[in-house]
Amino acid sequence: MTEKALRLGTRRSKLAMAQSGQVADAVSQVTGRPVELVEITTYGDTSREHLAQIGGTGVFVAALRDALLRGEVDFAVHSLKDLPTAQHEGLVVAAIPEREDPRDVVVARDARKLTDLPRGARVGTGAPRRMAQLNAYARTHGMEIETVPIRGNVDTRIGYVRSGELDAVVLAAAGLNRVGRIDEVTDFLSVDTVLPAPGQGALAVECAADNASLIAALAELDDPFTRAAVTAERSLLAALEAGCSAPVGALADLLADGQTVKEMRLRGVVGTTDGSTLVQLSTTGPVPETHEAALALGGELAAEMLAQGAAGLMGERAQ
């Protein structure tokens, strides 16, 4: 007798379906049970407003979480950068698989890199974080660009470049990789140029907190280094009281001595979207061995950033 299928709640977008499909295959291998994808439409998918206008935080996950709490699905897959930093009562992030490339990338006309864009180039992005850092980079390198707010899926965003409406768009490398379009990238942006969003490139697999057997099975997919890194990044975001649409970038990476991981470096940035002012700091310490240690690393760096005026650069802080 075939075991009952596990139901995986996912957004309907091509990217969400691709990443949910990868997780479904992994869960099926671990549990020996089939996994059925259950498509759910979220408010963030149907609204055409910019993320900053609709509140940003949680707009892509609320419907998935409601389905989990109602028992309509057994687990859900989120892009971690879309997940609110506060723990949701009754739910648990049972797995954070190994992270994909966290960098941002450029898809530009005529195969141009960021530094090769024509004077006055129109560069599309949906993220105030990217706008702040791209405009700051342009200011310090004698470039003239116009950052243009855009929404839409990968096809829509790249379509603006193909149609000539924009000279370039900036997207997450991980998303393009998951939908098989990484070969369209014309420039991989160094994290020294643009720090990614907290949790960018990582997935969160969430289920009911009282489903002990499923939590144990999903834990097989968890990558402890990725979890420590994104916990520190998201702790910084939470301590800044910033939502996922705020102009905040963060990246924790591991510093190795040969084959041995020695330390974790956490970098954070917050800035005005016109790029006129950035607060960018970093800290390095032992690799956090507990959830609390990772939280502390992010909180400490956030406190330093706030002491240097970060709060005044974010506009409206998350409520």
Curated annotation (Swiss-Prot):
Q: Which UniProt keywords are given for this protein, alphabetically ordered?
A: Porphyrin biosynthesis, Transferase
Catalysed reactions, semicolon-separated: 4 porphobilinogen + H2O = hydroxymethylbilane + 4 NH4(+)
Q: In which pathway does it act?
A: Porphyrin-containing compound metabolism; protoporphyrin-IX biosynthesis; coproporphyrinogen-III from 5-aminolevulinate: step 2/4
Q: Which residues cross the membrane?
A: none
Residues bearing the modification S-(dipyrrolylmethanemethyl)cysteine: C244
Q: Which GO terms describe its biological process?
A: heme biosynthetic process; protoporphyrinogen IX biosynthetic process
What binding details are noted for the cofactor?
Binds 1 dipyrromethane group covalently.
PANTHER family the UniProt entry points to: PORPHOBILINOGEN DEAMINASE
Extra information: The porphobilinogen subunits are added to the dipyrromethane group.
Q: What does this protein do?
A: Tetrapolymerization of the monopyrrole PBG into the hydroxymethylbilane pre-uroporphyrinogen in several discrete steps.
Q: How does it assemble?
A: Monomer.
Q: What is this protein called?
A: Porphobilinogen deaminase 1
Biological source species: Streptomyces coelicolor (strain ATCC BAA-471 / A3(2) / M145)
